[in-house]
Amino acid sequence: MVLLAAVALLVAAGAQENPEAAAGRGRILLVLPFDNRTGQPSLEWIHEAAPEVLSHRLSSAGFAPLSRGDRLYALDHLGLPQGFQPSHASSLKLAQTLDADSIIVGSYRTEGTRIEAQAQIISVPRLQMSQEVTATGELHNLVAVFDSLAWKLTRELDPAFNVAEETFVAAGANVNVEAFEQYIRGITEPDQAERLRHLQAAVKLNSEFSEAWMALAREDYAGQQYEQAAAAFAKVKGNDADSLEAGFYRGLALLFSGEYGKAEGAFAGVARMLPLAPVLNNQAVAISRQGHDATALFRQAESADPNGADYHFNLAVSLKRHGDAAGAQAELAQYMKLKPSDSEAQEMQTAWNAASASSVEPLERIERGFDAVAFRQAAVMLDQMEATRLAALSPDQRAQTLSTQAREYLSRGLLLESERLYQQAIAANDRSEAAHQGLAEVRERTGDTAGARKEAQAALTLQPSAESYLVLARLDMAAKQLDDANHDAGEALKLDPNSRAAKDVLRQLSAMQGAPKQ
């Protein structure tokens, strides 16, 4: 309940200003579409691809880039068309409308099969433009080129940022350019049928493409294709704001499909991270639709947002259904103060006052209006609370907490987010074995073998662990250093006799050496 109240208060305070401004002061970015200088209309889609990649990587790096939706909203607010190409002066006006601290502008050109992207940062308060940064590569490695550019921009924005460039590139390694092109066309196409066609092609080409699944799920949901939407939302494995939003709307899609038990689970998963009134309310509705008593959750939703009229209405209905007539009357009276002209509530009040049975029992109301901006705002507020909590811990406790959080990101394949937290853990306590060991795994996954070996050895110096020995074993096996790999895997098995990973490595080594498998 303390967390619930704290989040509610922070979000209520943040609602008085720009959603990101509450916690991202100095780090709010507006990434504009890049100029197409290729002379090829077929490559115009990269115009929107650039801000999409850069915004995702900058968000993972701890900045608060404004979304494409934010940008389109600001253009509309200024009376400008969606395809408007702003000058530097109009870019500043756009940024000021969105309270952005910096603007990123850029362009791209091709030469043969290669692409070069360049970008600059405009400081809104100082009206200064940075030096140009560039990234080049093969056109079929387009995502990697923009990942590299994102890393260079991050270093310009924060020279102390120490996540490796390889980690940025690895973050987009599973997205091929064909799927990415279909995704970009799917979010920019004005016709819904065409948007669906492109997005379906994107996820067919890459079944692990979370951003494409999210966009497809939104289209299905908007088209009231709730079963398809629920399935698509379940595929989203992005950052916290995206996964929370996906969980919430998956819950709604399941509610509207009559899958009340699954809807309850979806909302409960979101509520564990984000216990806000709309989430708690809908979890309670899903429970109630199964014939169970959800009064306690309805009460929590009302406590989180006392000015939300429907939360009083829902609590009144639940109390009445479960025999608390006086409590129901009191909650209905609170609702009527907020919405005195509601005809359904007026009929309920008349029937309840006359103690007569209503012909149709009212149903609790579903909260539908929690949008992407609200989720980003709430996630930023939670990050702010977490930063305050971490600052109060001792260096050792802070390193342990950050390493645990980083491990969770690593388990989801979010390498950039994971490395950022491991680096923070090492900054808090450079003798944290867990942080060095986790960073070794990140380095291994990004292909930085020297860095992985260095971190694994640092971890072993601090405290021997099976995980660190296994990193060395896999590196040695890949380098055909089979004796060393056998030794490392054997040491891992001594520390953890039940380690399946160590046994697998030993079996692979046995096969490579031509010996019979044990």
Indicate residue ranges for each PLM-predicted region.
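Structural signature of tandem alpha-helical TPR/SEL1-like repeats
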Residues: P190-H198, A222-K235, F256-G269, R289-Q300, ...
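TPR alpha-solenoid repeat register
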Residues: A212, A246, V279-L280, Y311, ...
